[in-house]
Amino acid sequence: TSTESMQILSSALTTHTKLVSKEFFNNENNMNKFIQNINKLMAHGSYVTKRQSTKLLASLIVIRSNNQLMNTYINSLDNLKLIMVLMTDKSKNLQHEAFNVFKVIVANPRKSKPVFDILVKNREKLLKYFETFGLECQEPTFIDEKEFIVQEIESLPRIVSSNNIDGNANVTTSPTGNVAAAQDM
């Protein structure tokens, strides 16, 4: 079954992490194929496949020896978009698994420009989403992680519209009120 297959894959990739990292994820071709395939499973699989694939990815990117996998995955705009879609799935369990990947993306202090830009563009929607996300979960670790992610999102520049001589223009303001011109996305 697909559940057994995912358990075997998960076990193979998480049991000997240094070996897997050195022999599998250090090969860029292998890593890119893995990302492409795990994304297919997360996007188009059954509920169980989506959840297990997302859970596997979340567990792999937090393993220190898989740093190259983590950096490659979390700096991709397409990967961020997929994770954001999964966070809006009707299944609370899948939302939580996707959050475990999303928090790594948001916590990254060296986000790629495309990832940073999409987070800025969706700042207000994300803050609204997190107002109700995970309210049923009283686990202290989850609550702390959610609070940290909300703080990180709140610290992103805010895009506001204002009129100038040329008409409407997007302007980015930092949480402290500093203003800078925003690039169109």
Model-derived regions: residue spans:
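Proline/serine/threonine/glycine-rich intrinsically disordered regulatory regions
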Residues: A98, V150, S161, A180-M185
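Active-site/pore-lining binding-face segments in mid-to-C-terminal subdomains
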Residues: T72-V106
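Alpha-helical scaffold repeats of the Armadillo/HEAT/TPR superfamily
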Residues: T1, K18-G45, L69-L82, K111-Q138, ...
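Generic C-terminal helix-cap and adjacent flexible tail
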Residues: S155-G167
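Eukaryote-specific intrinsically disordered, low-complexity regulatory regions enriched
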Residues: T1-E4, I8
